[in-house]
Amino acid sequence: MMPTPRPLPFSFASLAAALLAVIVAASPAFAAAPPKSEVVDLNAPVSYWKQIRPVFQANCQGCHQPAKNKGGYVMTDFTRLLAGGDSGEKAVVPHLPAKSPLVTAITLFEGEADMPKGKPPLTEPEVTLIAKWIAEGAVDDTPKNAVQHIDAAHPPVYQRSPAITSLDFSPDGKLLAVAGFHEVLLHHADGSGLVARLVGLSERIESVRFSPDGTRLAVAGGLPARMGEVQIWDVVKRTLVVSVPVGFDTVYGVSWSPDGKLIAFGCPDNNLRAIDAATGEAVLQQGSHSDWVLGTIFNQDGSHLISVGRDMSTKLTEVETQRFVDNISSITPGALRGGLHAIARRPGRDEVLIGGADGVPQLYQIFRQTKRRIGDNANLLRKFPAMEGRIFAVDYSRDGKLVAAASSFNGRGAVHLYTGEFDSKIPDVLLKAYADKVATAYSKEEKAEIERFTTAEVKLLASTKLTGGIYALAFSPDGRHLAAAGEDGHVRLITTTGGTVAKDFIPVPLARTKLTQRE
């Protein structure tokens, strides 16, 4: 059933004035300031690729794409964009905007528009621009090399396995989610076979995480230098439930709140963000980082969110107020030698494990016990033996007994297993020093006590050397295996008792014959 006809919001005689308000590159949800746009020639034909597509991408394609085609309508494919959906009526009638149901659906009538559902209506200049494009014939000027060829019916074809950026086991231990190209691959957790392929819009998949109950899968990624996207999949039905466009580049470090109601992620516009997992609605945006935000995790009760980034900081944010609370790790120059890439929470405690460019996994308490003083690192609980190269992934076993970290250095990779059980209570003598003195005033004895405490009961249990850098880690729920993957596209299941590789497999289906080059 098509929307009730409504009067169009423009006359073409006044079109030029309206077009002055249109941003050529429409801003997706939560967008930062867009790149500088070209000067718009108001007499030139409207470009679908440069002017119309960005509006649809930001406002419509989350619900109208091959993986989630509400009403049978797909707006990511030009032919299907014109054709319409289940009603059988064409959505776009070239040269006739007044007879195009798409224009009717997005036009305000008595302050409301039928589309986009559950979102703010398009602005009047945006609607006017779309109508002008249709009046000019609804021409498709999409570059040939930009036409989308991949969807669930036409999944990626691999000649070799791509680099793997993220892994996660389902809470019940039955599935292993693996980041691929344009998709997430669900495998049997023992590596015995592929279960499903979740193909979406995002070319690059940066992060995958199962919900606490295992019924949903959150995916962070996007189209590099064009759009970020957060996807939420129904694991049982293998269907896309929510798709949220975010900014102008891929997004990172997705995580779930303990109750499964919120999803957090980091962005290259230096913002930490969170959305409602059911609706995709924005609930948090915090801009305290000064560089890309690469990892996120909630504290035990979900009241606070912790993030790490390329700015060498670990930041604490209160969820309800969106208020920046504290720098958890030291921000003193030299305390951390490079950006932070990874974060995990210690089970049952408000403590976080972080790793980054300096190759040293470190454990911090989330909430400080003493007032911050210049140069202090008073939240540090443990330093683990250093790895060679940069750390790209860290994890804690579910029982809290083991810690793992993965690194990359000069084309080589390594996985370290450490002891994870120890008393992390800060001694009174250190609490007093942290409270009374700045770091440069610590005595020789106090410095020795800090070193003794932060390295106590910490032991390297196993070191596994691998081909290619390792970018992703995940403990199996039973703690018996550790999945590791990275540059060479292989997934290894490593035993946690000895650090040996029990299974090595390629997670993507490889083409049997070489592809011919596209013309």
Which residues fall in each region the model found?
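N-terminal secretory signal peptides that target proteins for export/translocation
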Residues: 1-12
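Residue-level detector of alpha-helical hydrophobic segments embedded in or interacting with membranes
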Residues: 2-4, 23, 29-30, 49, ...
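Aromatic- and Gly/Pro-enriched helix-to-coil junctions and flexible linker segments
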Residues: 28-171, 180-181
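Bacterial N-terminal signal peptides
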Residues: 13-27
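N-terminal leader/targeting signatures
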Residues: 6-8, 26, 501
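Generic detector of N-terminal low-structure segments
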Residues: 12-14, 32, 212, 300
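WD40-repeat beta-propeller superdomains and closely related acidic/aromatic-rich repeat-like regions
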Residues: 141-519
